């Protein structure tokens, strides 16, 4: 709920300022830094460190513009930096929809060829009219064979694991 409020506010402001692309890049940079240095997030969220020290730390990086810095400092002031992953996921979904891109999570037992990826795009294009489809590929050896696609909570699974589970249920 809280992460939705922050992602909505950032999205509306970025839309108003025509800064969607810029914020996407900066948010990706921030997420990458946060994953590489998880203690940094703990530090930014800590009430023991003054906000102006945190602001100075972020400013000294020199990679965030004023709009994104204000957003980060809002999270810092309210001790909500730890929500960055949830906010980022929601932000990406909103920004991709604005750009008419469907970001589909694709799970397979092994990496898929470009030809197979294009076949899958064609198969699901009817379900996502007017959107360009991009896959975020994940390897999941438990699928054994086949694929599972997830988009905004909806899922299509065509895997050997699912077929075996279905047979087991029917027996």
UniProtKB/Swiss-Prot annotation:
Membrane topology: Peripheral membrane protein
Recorded superkingdom: Bacteria
Keyword list, A-Z: ATP synthesis, Cell membrane, CF(1), Hydrogen ion transport, Ion transport, Membrane, Transport
Localization in the cell: Cell membrane
Principal subcellular localization: membrane
Record bears the keyword rRNA-binding: no
A matching Pfam family: OSCP
Cross-referenced InterPro entries: ATP_synth_OSCP/delta_N_sf, ATPase_OSCP/dsu
GO-annotated molecular function: proton-transporting ATP synthase activity, rotational mechanism
GO CC terms of this entry: plasma membrane; proton-transporting ATP synthase complex
Family statement: Belongs to the ATPase delta chain family.
Complex formation: F-type ATPases have 2 components, F(1) - the catalytic core - and F(0) - the membrane proton channel. F(1) has five subunits: alpha(3), beta(3), gamma(1), delta(1), epsilon(1). F(0) has three main subunits: a(1), b(2) and c(10-14). The alpha and beta chains form an alternating ring which encloses part of the gamma chain. F(1) is attached to F(0) by a central stalk formed by the gamma and epsilon chains, while a peripheral stalk is formed by the delta and b chains.
PANTHER family tied to this protein: ATP SYNTHASE DELTA CHAIN
Main function: F(1)F(0) ATP synthase produces ATP from ADP in the presence of a proton or sodium gradient. F-type ATPases consist of two structural domains, F(1) containing the extramembraneous catalytic core and F(0) containing the membrane proton channel, linked together by a central stalk and a peripheral stalk. During catalysis, ATP synthesis in the catalytic domain of F(1) is coupled via a rotary mechanism of the central stalk subunits to proton translocation. This protein is part of the stalk that links CF(0) to CF(1). It either transmits conformational changes from CF(0) to CF(1) or is implicated in proton conduction.
Name of protein: ATP synthase subunit delta
């Amino acid at each position: 709920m809280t992460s939705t409020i922050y992602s909505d506010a950032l999205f509306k402001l970025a839309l108003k300022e025509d800064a969607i692309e810029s914020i996407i890049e900066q948010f990706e940079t921030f997420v990458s830094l946060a994953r590489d240095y998880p203690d940094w997030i703990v530090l930014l969220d800590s009430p023991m460190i003054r906000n102006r020290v945190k602001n100075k730390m972020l400013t000294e990086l020199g990679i965030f513009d004023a709009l994104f810095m204000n957003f980060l400092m809002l999270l810092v002031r309210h001790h909500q930096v730890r929500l960055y992953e949830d906010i980022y996921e929601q932000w990406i979904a909103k920004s991709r929809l604005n750009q008419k891109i469907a970001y589909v999570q694709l799970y397979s037992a092994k990496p898929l060829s470009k030809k197979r990826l294009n076949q899958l795009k064609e198969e699901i294009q009817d379900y996502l009219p007017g959107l360009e489809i991009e896959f975020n590929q994940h390897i999941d050896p438990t699928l054994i064979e086949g694929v599972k696609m997830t988009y905004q909570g909806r899922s299509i699974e065509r895997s050997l694991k699912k077929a075996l589970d279905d047979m087991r249920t029917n027996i």
